[in-house]
Regions:
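N-terminal secretory signal peptides that target proteins for export/translocation
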Residues: 1-7
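Small-residue-enriched, tightly packed secondary-structure blocks
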Residues: 27-190
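C-terminal segment of classical bacterial N-terminal signal peptides
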Residues: 15-28
């Protein structure tokens, strides 16, 4: 009797696909109105500040904070992610944005996460405001914070253009990256 690995591989892929499908369907709907986005952004910042005290310090000195409270990422060989958020200046929403990314390669699953980008310089704010769509990794330098880096960061040691914090990760998919994500200004629904 000849045995192959194809059967177990198909089973694992099917389980991953079903799990990913269930997670995407169970995930909260992408916010569509300004009020919904504002509410989700407020909740996300409270959670981020509780999880990463360094974010509180950056909030005090950042020129602007771009917050995407719920980004959905899913894929099976070909993947994508999408989320909507707001740019805050001095605690008030001044514009709305979406984040979109596509990927391909060895991947299977789905996850949701949020991220906040602290724009520390006028140049970073100008770049965001003047671009027709900003691809992360092109333009101002972005430092994605991990726990170790966040512990040593203070408002006086923050010298980069943009600091990003990823938070609230849920799901079954390896890795989160912001590189290549395109951020574009939107007009949310009423």
């Amino acid at each position: 009797m000849k045995r192959t690995l194809l059967g177990p591989v198909k089973t694992v892929l099917l389980l991953l696909l079903l799990t990913a499908n269930g997670m995407v369907l169970a995930a909260p709907a992408v916010a569509g109105t300004a009020a919904e986005i504002d509410q989700e952004v407020g909740v996300a910042l409270v959670k981020l500040h509780a999880a990463a005290p360094a974010a509180i310090e950056l909030t005090k000195v950042a020129k602007g904070i771009l917050v995407f409270p719920n980004v959905i990422k899913a894929g099976l060989v070909i993947g994508g992610q999408y989320g909507e958020g707001a740019l805050l200046v001095e605690g008030k929403t001044v514009a709305y944005y979406n984040t979109i990314a596509a990927s391909y390669g060895l991947q299977a699953g789905a996850q949701s996460f949020g991220y906040a980008m602290f724009l520390m310089t006028n140049e970073a704010m100008d770049y965001l405001n003047k671009s027709e769509g900003w691809e992360v990794g092109v333009g101002p330098s972005v430092v994605v914070m991990d726990e170790g880096m966040a512990k040593s960061l203070t408002s006086s040691t923050a010298k980069e253009d943009i600091y990003a914090f990823i938070f609230g990760q849920k799901g079954l998919m390896a890795g989160i990256g912001l590189q290549g994500s395109k951020i574009t200004k939107i007009t949310p629904g009423q």
